[in-house]
């Protein structure tokens, strides 16, 4: 018998409904309870009466967006950005910055309070400027052959469409100044279909720019690009299908307060917020309470953002990173900064590392700054190192909670926590935590 395929019927979404918003979650979504179901509503504030368009509905929760504001909150503010309604970037600009921060901090502290009986010292928030804080940006490029128009900007939320922008209020002023000039440059490009994207970084020694193209540069375009880089003092890199070429200027770098200078390649990860990166490093150094006799381990160390400053206060510092090119850069940064008591090793921290030679050293203190996926596997091995203090920098509250539970299980106590508002006007929540081994 032939079984005919019958497509599954799409569940029909309920019609728009009206509700009063009761709360705000840490991602900037309004929260309403309707007949036992929790609804998370985009662009809604507490105490507002809103008409809600349903985006998705599950058994226990639903997701919607404001279709119409029937009664606005006195807290609602006019978004500063001209592209706010269409850009997929900063989605919390209608919320006053103090409320954004208070809501994130409250959510973080409430989650962590439930994990241990002992009191946790909740430290003042680490925050900075709410605008012009981003020193790095990736711009999408799209050539519309029909209108003969090149779009430079960001993708719309939940869409592949590009929002054509001339400025962005969260970018470093040096990057903002270049945006209209990039429009002007690329409008005369001979092969606009070959344009991929642009990455810009406001380094401490100037602006670095990477242009991604799908084929080798035409001579006309290469000349335009080199003239642009020379006239605007831009460190220029071009990436085609085969390689990245450094065409003009020095390697970018940034400097920390202790004098450490970290050189990096244009595509390397660096913290986007210059000011808060420094504040975060200062906090880590303070909480670790470093001594001249200490041996310190820095996991997920990148190019040495924490390792090099740590090394200036201790007997030895060891940095571990999974990506070999980053390890090589960290070593070069250590040499340039005359940090002779620091060593860097490549190791996959999602695999067992207890048999590695570097792991056989008795470490007094440990710092880890893992990716969003957290550090669960690494923590299983860390328990054997018996360090007295661990500082954990997190960029994901969900994996932080999971990893805190592991550390508590392994005999550590959560002593201090501070929220880091690294990305104002977004849903991102970062934090730094101090753990001490139970005696």
UniProtKB/Swiss-Prot annotation:
It catalyses: uridine(1939) in 23S rRNA + S-adenosyl-L-methionine = 5-methyluridine(1939) in 23S rRNA + S-adenosyl-L-homocysteine + H(+). The active site is at residue 395. CDD domains: AdoMet_MTases. One of its GO terms (biological process) is rRNA base methylation. This is 23S rRNA (uracil(1939)-C(5))-methyltransferase RlmD. S-adenosyl-L-methionine binds at residues 271, 300, 305, 321, 348, 369. It comes from Histophilus somni (strain 129Pt). PANTHER family: 23S RRNA (URACIL(1939)-C(5))-METHYLTRANSFERASE RLMD, RNA M5U METHYLTRANSFERASE. GO terms for molecular function: 4 iron, 4 sulfur cluster binding; iron ion binding; RNA binding; rRNA (uridine-C5-)-methyltransferase activity.
